[in-house]
Amino acid sequence: KLMTLIKSISGIRGTIGGSPEDGLNPLAIVKFVAAYATFIRKNTKVETNKIVVGRDARISGPMVKQVVLGTLTGMGFDVVDIDLATTPTTELAVTMEGACGGIILTASHNPKQWNALKLLNEKGEFLNAAEGAEVLRIAAAEDFEFADVDHLGKVIPNATYKQKHIESVLNLDLVDVEAIKAANFRVAIDCVNSVGGIVIPDLLYALGVKEIFKLHCAPHGNFSHNPEPIPENLTEISDLMGHAKADVGFVVDPDVDRLAIICENGEMFNEEYTLVAVSDYVLSHTPGNTVSNLSSSRALRDVTVSYTHL
């Protein structure tokens, strides 16, 4: 089998298995995590010695996590293990814990044989290009040193962050739970057999949605279809929308940092307009600037500009 290991400024990703330089396996993981820990120790701006680790529901997740936990504690860091969690939840946990960094174990929308390590700073944000390059340099040079027996870290399991994240959403001024309850929405969801299945239903119930039609919510990591949320992979939920007479459908990728919205007629609401629609709502209540990524459409700019006269 052809194995792949891709090293980039945003982390490492690869197919599980292979020789140390050819796949994502324990030796590759140890080297890279030790380099990240060395980088954090030299550069962190916070006093704590904690790093948060969360993962999606990939089959390889438990193995990768054990190697990551062992390496971080071997480098002298205490690890807050939040286990199965969405990428945004792990990012939130870093700041809530006052941690000096975080590692997310997910290959996002890649197929099940892939996994990856995504690296966060103390703000719960991804490392920038220069920081990522420095981690790669440390890894290549093996310029790291493990802790002695009196300075090993410990693992701190913490299963509270799913609920903390849901509560932080409910506490947002712009989230009108009463309006959602009153609408009596019928909602279909497809969570592609990963961590969306353990958080999206609970979030919807907390928002007052009573009728949820679930597809692939068991988080076993054997993805029921190609996990990238694009139209050709979403035929099943489109069919369900009609049978269930659902008002809206939501599809997430394995680590829940991508969202596809399905309209009541079963067609996909164009992904690049999701941000535009949300921005329109936010700006109508709190006018101001928006920040976009390179894949955002011009429509976001147009919506933002339309509110500048208010």
Regions found by a protein language model. Give the residues of each.
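An N-terminal, well-structured beta->alpha segment
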Residues: 2-70, 74-75, 155-185
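Conserved beta-strand elements of the Class I
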Residues: 52, 101, 187-188, 291
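Acidic, glycine-rich loop-and-beta core segments that form the ion-binding/anion-interacting portion
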Residues: 231-302
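Conserved small/polar residues in nucleotide/adenosyl-binding loops
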Residues: 308-309
